[in-house]
């Protein structure tokens, strides 16, 4: 669907006409409501993207409903900071580190398994021509930034999904805009 896009053809008419959800949006909402209300178990949720702050509500809800929560993308580095790891020049939200730590604790208390990357593709700069290097999550150099999950993490995440009866996925695991990290 396109409801999330801020393009003139999507948002323009709604400013001048009565607006309602279309059939596709209604179907998506019904599907998600069903998934979260009574998921077939095991329920594995995968959340990626760049910022914890933009997904905080989703993450909180998933800790209450998922059996396993897989975290990737730029938001993983904020969780690494909450665990006391160094993240080099990686994207991070310093203001959300404490909240990320609280979410890790909440998941542990509820018996929800949290999977974070165990290795990462890093680079010396953010750009299309950046050359990936693979490093362990606890060994990100100070002059490198995380751009994607690494090959061991890909295997770990694939294994976690294999036995799932329900999988919910929202957001990318890396900088998909650059071919070397897509």
How would you label these PLM feature ranges?
Residues 1-182:
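Active-site loop-to-helix "anion-binding N-cap" substructures in soluble metabolic enzymes
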């Amino acid at each position: 669907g396109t409801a999330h896009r801020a393009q003139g053809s999507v948002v323009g008419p709604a400013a001048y006409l009565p607006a309602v959800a279309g059939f596709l949006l209604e179907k998506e909402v019904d599907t998600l409501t069903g998934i979260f209300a009574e998921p077939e178990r095991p329920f594995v949720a995968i959340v990626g993207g760049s910022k914890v702050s933009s997904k905080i509500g989703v993450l909180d809800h998933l800790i209450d409903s998922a059996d396993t929560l897989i975290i990737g993308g730029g938001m993983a580095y904020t969780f690494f900071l909450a665990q006391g790891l160094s993240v080099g020049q990686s994207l991070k939200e310093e203001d959300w580190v404490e909240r990320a730590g609280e979410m890790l604790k909440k998941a542990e208390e509820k018996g929800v398994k949290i999977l974070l990357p165990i290795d990462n593709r890093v680079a010396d700069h953010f750009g299309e021509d950046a050359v990936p290097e693979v490093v362990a999550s606890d060994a990100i150099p100070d002059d490198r930034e995380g751009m994607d999950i690494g090959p061991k993490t890909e295997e770990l995440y694939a294994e976690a999904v294999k036995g799932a009866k329900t999988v919910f996925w929202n957001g990318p695991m890396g900088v998909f805009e650059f071919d070397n990290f897509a």
